[in-house]
């Protein structure tokens, strides 16, 4: 039943309207049977008791038949509900809305992709806001590319350039390293700022064309290529269950990066702060000022890739 008192059946039928119409039809039939039919040509007077008995018999049979039909409808509708749609195609312009919807209805999130720009800038804040608002614990697993693997970084940047030629100049090895470092630094800080957040970070050594976002309600499969639709698999679908297992195995085969507590829980505001946190995390050791500045910029001004790249 919705806020207007409307109660919908399996096919969206207004139950109250249906029952009211059925009652009105029954009353009309009784009036016709008692007062109209006896006055038709050649009709004999019918006693009230005979009419009531006839009506009760008819209604009893109708009620039994209606009950059987209703049970069949409920049974088959229940089977339909137990077998959700296996996959839905999400238009490029609707991807952000679908991810936001999933983030606002989950207590866990598993990400597997490349730099996690969108996750860091948009999904993660939504997850934290929901956890704080409802007092729930939040479990987050994030798998990004290993920023210290130079060959991997070069392979990814070349792939990213080819996937989006209009932004070819944006992606460089340093840009990719900076975006990944910004994601890790953000997660490291938040994991100690929010007691209800359980966060684990994994470093992958291979590049996939797909980005996986797994929540309690669905799994979203997106691609780096601009203008490409996403695939959404709802919870209960075979692919959703398979993806959960795949993510678990993939994380086990990746390198988990510890998130040590900083003595000052730094929220980097300068190049020296970034250098200190990277040293604490033991990634990108010996990074020069250019890379540190790129990392600081990515951290302080996260970019929504669906809006600009």
Indicate residue ranges for each PLM-predicted region.
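N-terminal alpha-helical membrane-insertion module
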Residues: 1-95
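A broadly tuned preference for mixed-charge, low-complexity surface segments
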Residues: 29-34, 124, 157-171, 257-284
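PLD-like (HKD) phosphodiesterase/transphosphatidyltransferase domain
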Residues: 71-162, 286-309
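HKD-type phospholipase D/PLD-like phosphodiesterase module
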Residues: 153-210
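HKD (HxKxxxxD) catalytic microenvironment of the phospholipase D
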Residues: 199-240
């Amino acid at each position: 039943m919705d806020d207007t008192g409307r109660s919908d059946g399996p096919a969206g039928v207004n139950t109250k309207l249906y029952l009211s119409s059925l009652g009105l039809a029954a009353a009309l039939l009784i009036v016709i049977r008692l007062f109209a039919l006896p006055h038709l040509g050649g009709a004999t007077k019918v006693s009230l008791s005979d009419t009531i008995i006839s009506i009760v018999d008819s209604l009893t049979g109708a009620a039994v038949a209606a009950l059987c039909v209703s049970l069949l409808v409920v049974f088959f509708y229940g089977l339909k509900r137990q077998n959700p749609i296996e996959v839905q195609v999400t238009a490029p312009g609707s991807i952000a809305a679908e991810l936001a919807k999933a983030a606002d209805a989950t207590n866990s999130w598993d990400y597997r992709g490349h730099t996690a720009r969108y996750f860091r800038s948009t999904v993660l804040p939504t997850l934290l806001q929901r956890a704080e608002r409802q007092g729930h614990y939040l479990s987050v697993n994030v798998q990004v590319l290993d920023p210290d693997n130079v060959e991997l970084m070069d392979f990814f940047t070349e792939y990213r350039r080819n996937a989006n030629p209009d932004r070819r100049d944006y992606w460089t090895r340093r840009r990719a390293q900076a975006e990944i470092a910004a994601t890790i630094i953000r997660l490291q800080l938040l994991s100690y700022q929010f007691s209800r957040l359980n966060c684990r970070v994994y470093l992958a050594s291979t590049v996939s064309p797909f980005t996986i976002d797994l929540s309690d309600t669905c799994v979203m499969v997106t691609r780096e290529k601009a203008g490409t639709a996403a695939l959404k698999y709802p919870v209960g679908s075979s692919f959703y269950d398979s993806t959960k297992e795949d993510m678990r195995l993939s994380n086990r085969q990746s390198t988990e990066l510890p998130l040590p507590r900083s003595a000052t829980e730094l929220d980097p505001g300068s190049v020296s702060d970034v250098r200190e946190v990277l040293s604490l995390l033991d990634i990108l050791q010996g990074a020069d000022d250019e890379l540190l500045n790129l990392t600081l910029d990515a951290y302080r001004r996260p970019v929504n890739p669906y809006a600009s790249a």
